[in-house]
């Protein structure tokens, strides 16, 4: 951890590693969003063929769940795109509260993180 404290930012090589990880996660997230949108479109075009329970509430619940999943996925995509901007600006991995580097382990688990664990726990 001392190595992290001594550095002001990640090296260009480290940033490239994170960029590749973010781009991979971004591609997956966009594919999932497209899937959710297609499911919503299918339900809108032909609600009777996809799901029909004992009442019309089943279709509405499924529609709402898909909408929430799509919305959450859109937020993830925005966070990942913002992370790519930070990589480009060479500010990626710097905690927005403490100004210290976020650990590589945390960034690998949550590549769009903007808070170190120290700052997150303090919230």
List the model feature ranges, each with a label.
Residues 1-86:
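Interaction interfaces in information-processing and related assembly proteins
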């Amino acid at each position: 951890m001392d190595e992290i404290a001594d550095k002001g930012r990640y090296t260009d090589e480290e940033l490239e590693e994170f960029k590749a990880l973010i781009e991979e996660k971004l591609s997956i997230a966009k594919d999932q969003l497209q899937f959710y949108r297609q499911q919503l479109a299918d339900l809108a075009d032909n609600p009777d063929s996809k799901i029909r329970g004992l009442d019309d509430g089943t279709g509405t619940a499924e529609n709402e769940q898909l909408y929430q999943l799509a919305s959450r996925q859109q937020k993830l995509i925005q966070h990942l795109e913002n992370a790519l901007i930070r990589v480009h600006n060479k500010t990626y991995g710097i905690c927005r509260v403490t100004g210290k580097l976020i650990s590589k382990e945390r960034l690998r688990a949550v590549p769009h993180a903007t808070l170190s664990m120290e700052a997150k726990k303090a919230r």
